[in-house]
């Protein structure tokens, strides 16, 4: 590495808000299954506190050694609906509390996996877990929850979609932060290091390390140097910058896996913003020539950014996965917040952007009075985009306050302006239930 590359890396960290967003340890809990829920909870606590006991210390040591901030250390576990199904319990809150207790003991920021996979229907444990979500998130501090309600191979479980509209409302009513820790997915991935949607897939190794990087500020600074150049130059600039960011992520992941003695999983190529000025995906899009995010051209700019991040990242690291693309959470991106406040960005434009980027309608506050059926219809729309386009989409929305209010989540989750929602009813549509079939192009065997 020549001196120019060294100084570039230092500038990325000191001036451009580059950091490793998360080191996430995925842990299988399949060997914790027990017919007695209290025994299952005890086994879960013991396994997590044994396997992840050094995760935070190792993360801090690597950060100090490399001089690169590692913002979060997290754990993801096997979907708890699979563990709870062996018990006779009608309530999985004790398992959520075991996760929370373990997370606090080892000092991680969040623990994900209070989850269910219901894309084609409910099993016993799925229904119990989903109905346990509001209390589980209200009575814990670090637990995150997710539900997969659709996939390209199976279509969309509209009964589950309707249920999740109700569950999101109940969760928001029971606790201020609960809905911010609940994600509804289509095409959920098994190796996602980012919260709140992380869970450890059953096809994964017993314990793995997955890494998520963050570098919107680095990309913006690189684009500032090519103002007025053609899109060919813009694309090449983003690709080269993504390569550097991902290379560092791979180094951190490999070091962590060696120190902890566990398998290295993937680097998630996602560009994840924070509420800090200079760490915004929206400002990257504006640097391409948009007056403000939300205006015409926004979706095209996001498409270029997303694709070139993937191309640069894949060149830098063999093991890539997770969500891998640009995140557009409203509350966690100061540029997105500004665009909502000035009226240039609305829910409909955000939905169009989700056809391009990672995840979907993320960290968006909507009026508290929004009906559960309308929330369910938003989930259905996002799921349709994911299922038809063979990509991950999701909804993480928070029904709080009234239109125009500002909802404060604090720290990494930021602040969200309450956005306008279409007032026309979707109730009769959602009441149908059943399954929207898989698209024709899913039939590939």
Curated annotation (Swiss-Prot):
Entries under SUPFAM superfamilies matching the protein: PFL-like glycyl radical enzymes (SSF51998)
Signal peptide positions on this chain: none
Pfam families: DUF711
Superkingdom in the source lineage: Bacteria
UniProt cross-references to InterPro entries, sorted A to Z: UPF0210
Family to which this protein belongs: Belongs to the UPF0210 family.
Self-association and partners: Homodimer.
PANTHER family hit by this protein: UPF0210 PROTEIN MJ1665, UPF0210 PROTEIN SPR0218
This protein's name: UPF0210 protein SSA_2018
Lineage, top ranks: Bacteria, Bacillati, Bacillota, Bacilli, Lactobacillales
